[in-house]
Amino acid sequence: MAQLEGKVALITGASQGLGRALALAYAREGARLVVNARSEERLRPVAEEVEALGAEVVALPADVADSESVDRLVSQAADRFGGIDVLVNNAGLLGPRVKIEEFPEDEWRRVIDANLTGLFLVSKASIPHLNAGASVINLVSGVSVEGRPEWGAYSVSKFGVEGLNQILAAELEDRDVRVNAVDPGGMNTEMRAAAYSREDAESRVAPEENVDVFLYLASDDSRGVTGERFKAQEFRRR
């Protein structure tokens, strides 16, 4: 049997990069998918790719930083499938790579809202719909445990995700819901290219090659594992 046969997975930020790769990987393993991004135009091709693999999928555009939009997203997902087994909080923005003294306040708020508040809103709305044995996977980063120059709001937002991951793990453990964080490491994505414009993109792992830990955490193999932090590329090499 496929690892995720019959499981319902909601993936935010699924129109490109890692989110798209996870949607396709989960589809191959038998999951039913709810794919989300802000842009319906960019989301539609991913849904078509998932359908081509024979998986059931619904594409639901929504802004994770807007509570009304998030409530509609989650309620539509739950109405369609009856509950959620896997939640991947993947949506996020990089923001400007400038020093704090130069960081525009509106950009600061935009990044914090997308990366931290958005994860809070999606998680909060999803909790009542999480099935027993569900798995929540939160995306973190190397700069969520070590502040570095010119990473500003992105780094701060991911520090917040680290804390929220621990809080959710503790609060949901008695509901048989596990919550874990994953640092995907550097990948060949648009966000990575924006952060490191001079880097050779081909030197980085493709998102499609970086899904092993996400499959593990979504599957029943990880039951009982909660409050942990994984490095995807180290897990991939095991």
Can you say where each PLM-predicted feature lies in the sequence?
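Conserved glycine-rich Rossmann-like NAD(P)H-binding loop of the short-chain dehydrogenase/reductase
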Residues: 29-46
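The beta1-alpha1 cofactor-binding region of Rossmann-like NAD(H)/NADP(H)-dependent oxidoreductases
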Residues: 40-41, 61-73, 105
